[in-house]
Each structure stands twice: as structure tokens, then as C-alpha cells.
């Protein structure tokens, strides 16, 4: 804690010295746009660090001066409680992945199921009949939406069992199995083989492009394999 206090005081002193030089020689100095941007970020970081040092919570904390758009995202995983970088909400149609939403800030993907379904229907021009999704999507609003439009889901049933519950249970099991093998498997493939485990881009635009090309390069390879298998069967 003492070291942190000293670091904050040192940064305050350096900024004060910089402001003194600027007030005296500012007319003779020429600053780049990038310089002004970085200086503004450093000032924000100082304010945030002082607030945290005083025990106040900072909701929009900057964790990197170079990548100032990145925010800490609480994941709740055993090996990584907090992650830094883009959070992507994907949909998958017949093994092909599409980016439904991407953000460098935390968001609740559980409220995005309706958007996912609408996106799939817009892409395929076919009404969605079945949906397999993580338990975070199984909220009451999504359940009501799916029931209203006759969409079967992998969600664990709430309330009394229907007459055809055995059939529904089989369908839920199959949907969950497909999701586990296809969607979860695709995440590992994209990270291991398409450079998404460690993104080395240095700004927001190139980072988004890196993610986009990683996902869609994996899609392209999968589509080539599908065409090859289809051709082999037809031969």
C-alpha cells in the first residue's frame, strides 16, 4: 500500500512538472494528436487509481494505456476469475460461427437470445425451430419468447411436466449434446489453430479484425471440408 501511494504521488508530480513546462513553453511546443490522447488517458488513470486507493469502486477501470478501450471482465472461471480483451457472443448454424455481438466491456449475453434468433432468421431466411444455449440464456423472458414462437430449447424444464415430457427430454438431451460437441469444440479449435488464444493486435480496429478473420478462417476451412465430404459421397 505504501508503494502504491508513492507511485500515485510520483505520477502526480510528473504531471505537475509537465503542466509547468507547458504553461511556460507551450507556445513553442508542438504536440501530436496521439500525445494529447495518451496524456488524457494517463490523467484518467491517475484519477481512477486515487479512487481505488481510497477504497472506492471504479466501474469503468482503464487497465492499459496503449489499449485503453479494454476493460476487466469478470468471468467466474476457476483458472481465470477476470479476463481482459474482447467478449464475443457467437451463434452457430450447422457448425458455422457468426459474431452476434462483440464488446471490450462486460455485457450480459443472457439477454441477447432474441437478437441471436433474429440474426439467424435474417441470415438463413428460415424460421428457427430449435435452440441450444448455455444455462445463462435460460431466463424467464427467453423461455416465454421461445414458447410464444414454438421454439424448442435445451433449457432444463421449470414447473410441471407436460404430457410429452419424455420426448421433450430426448430433444433437450440431443440439443445439449450438439451444442457441447459443435459450439464448445469450435471455441477450442479457433483458439488453438487460428490465433485467438493470444491476440497480439495493438489497437481496437486491428483486434476486431484479428477476431473476425480467426473465426471466419475457421469457418472457411470447415466449409471446404463439408464440400469435400459431399463430393466424395456423391462420387
PLM features per residue range, with description:
Residues 1-235:
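Anion-binding and metal-coordination hotspots
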